[in-house]
Each structure stands twice: as C-alpha cells, then as structure tokens.
A protein has these predicted regions:
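C-terminal engagement/docking regions of AAA+ P-loop ATPases
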Residues: 231-305
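Walker A/P-loop
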Residues: 27-67
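AAA+/P-loop NTPase substrate/partner-engagement loops
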Residues: 56-84
Length: 305
C-alpha cells in the first residue's frame, strides 16, 4: 500500500503547492494514530490540507468553527425528547466524523476545549451518562493562531502535549504562489480528487505501522534526544515520556511512507520538529528561536548511533 501513500502525497501536492514535507508530516501523524495541530496565519492552506487528506483517503469530513460561545454539546451532541415515542434520542454532534477540522480551537472556552481533547484522547464520547465510541479512523486537525495573534483562550501546555505533532505551513515560495495564481481554483481541484485509499485500508496501515522495526540502537537514540532535552538549560522543561512515544510512532510512520519496514536515524530526525517543538519552551534570553532551530539543536547535540 506504499504506492497508495505516495499517490496521496502526489495528489495533495498538486493542490497544496510547495508543501510536500508538511503533507508528509500530516500523513505520518495520521498513520501513527495521533492528532495534528497547525499553528499558522489565516489563508496559508490549513483548511485545504484537511480537505485534501479527507478526499484522498475517503474519510468522512466535518469542519468545526470554534467560537467563544460554543458549548461542549455543540461538538459532542445532545439528547432531544421525542414526543411520539416519549423517550430521549441522542443526536450525535460533528465530532462523530472520521476527520475533524477544529478551526481556531483557541477561540473556545477551556470547558469546550476539554470536551474535544477528551474525545481525541479516548476515541470516545461520554454524553448524557452514556459512552459512545467514535468512528475509526479518527483524526483531528486543529488550528490556532500564532503566539502573537493569540485567541481568547490559548491552549495550555498540558493540552498542547495531547497533539502528537504540530506543524506550520508558512507562505509559499514565489514560484508556487505564481502557479497558484495562474492555476485552477483550489475548490474545483478538491472536488475532483479521487480516493487513493478507503477507511478500512487506512486502519490496516495504522496497524502495520506498529510492526515497523525499531532497532535497539534507535531506541537508544530516541532516549538520548529526550534525555538531552531534560538536562539542557535551554528549555524550561524537557520532553515527556508521551513525547518519546510520539517520536517513536511517527518515525515508524515516516519509514512506512518511505517504503521501508525499519526505522533509520533519518526518520527520527525528519519527524522531530513536528513532535518536539510545541512541547519544548526555550528559556527566554531575548533571542527568538524557530521550530527548526530547536530541532536542529537537538539533532546536533546527540550523536547518531
């Protein structure tokens, strides 16, 4: 099925120009059964990326636009009394979809954010005293504004850690933007996309990711990166055990996308920026450090096995 994964990447790259690496990161996060946070400016393609993944993978898609007056029931669903039967019937909310775009999640209140994050973590929803499983596969792509354009309720560190990866799309380069201006309307391109996989095949791939071999030396390498982040005076706190698990899972997924059944150090390095940078908070010293700066610093500090 690696050919199908390459087809997904190629198809998405024709719609989202010049962002193949970010597309691969998003796909790796999905294959690793994680959830993705995109922190970037409006208009750079966050919604388009979610739409393209949903169409290419044949997934049921729902966009939730978060606002400050949104309630948990608006996401999870609500029971409504039906006069004919004399009973309450549960009406599922938009969370009961396979791919969710949680747009501007930092606009919602902490209570509503917690409802989303519980569903992400548990793959189930508890509403009206009853627990209901969410569909498989289940993937959340959440967006929030950059730190200098914070919303009403920025996600706290403990909730940021629930996202397996965080990426930035950034502005397209000059050639990609020119091609975007001269090309076909993106909405028309998305509507014309054909599924490269079906949900059942995607679930099978997610199971196969767990079987990608990680040599003991690679486990040592991952542990060394995590331990260095904890000892380093550059960071307020280091990477958690959850981050180490995420790094391992995403490296396995990246290796699968590359068509291999084993993980190389290059796979760990490729996914490290997405896994680590939203979990690491540099000590403020007047120097602004980008996500890539942080990842490069970790890679350079830890010898490759």
């Amino acid at each position: 099925m690696s050919l199908s994964l390459n087809h997904v990447i190629q198809q998405a790259s024709r719609v989202i120009l010049g962002k193949e690496r970010q597309i691969r990161m998003a796909l790796a996060c999905l294959l690793a059964r994680g959830h993705l946070l995109i922190e970037d400016l409006p208009g750079v393609g966050k919604t388009t990326l979610a739409h393209v993944l949903a169409r290419s993978l044949g997934l049921q898609f729902h966009r939730i636009q978060f606002t400050s007056d949104m309630l948990p029931a608006d996401i999870l669903g609500v029971s409504i009394y039906e006069r004919d039967s004399g009973t309450f019937k549960f009406h599922p909310g938009p969370i009961f979809s396979q791919l969710i775009l949680a747009d501007e999640v930092n606009r919602a209140t902490p209570k509503t954010q917690s409802a989303l994050l519980e569903a992400m973590e548990e793959h189930q929803v508890t509403a009206e005293g009853e627990t209901r499983r969410l569909p498989e596969p289940f993937f959340v792509v959440a967006t929030q504004n950059p730190s200098h354009q914070v919303g009403t309720f920025p996600l706290p560190e403990s909730q940021l850690d629930r996202f397996q990866m965080r990426i930035e799309l950034g502005y397209p380069d000059r050639d990609a933007e020119r091609a975007l201006l001269q090309g076909v309307e993106r909405r028309d391109m998305i509507a014309a996309l054909e599924p490269c996989l079906n949900p059942g095949e995607l679930v099978e791939l997610q199971q196969n990711v767990k079987r990608v071999h990680v040599a003991p030396a690679l486990f040592d390498y991952i542990q060394a990166i995590v331990e260095h982040s904890r000892r380093s005076p550059e960071f307020v706190t280091g990477l958690s055990p959850r981050a180490a698990l995420a790094l391992t899972a995403c490296a396995r997924a990246w290796a699968m996308i590359e068509g291999r059944d084993h993980v190389l150090p290059e796979d760990v390095q490729a996914v490290l920026p997405g896994v680590a940078t939203h979990r690491l908070h540099p000590v403020v010293n007047g120097v602004r450090r980008t996500s890539s700066d942080i990842a490069v610093g970790l890679v350079e500090a830890v010898p490759i096995p």
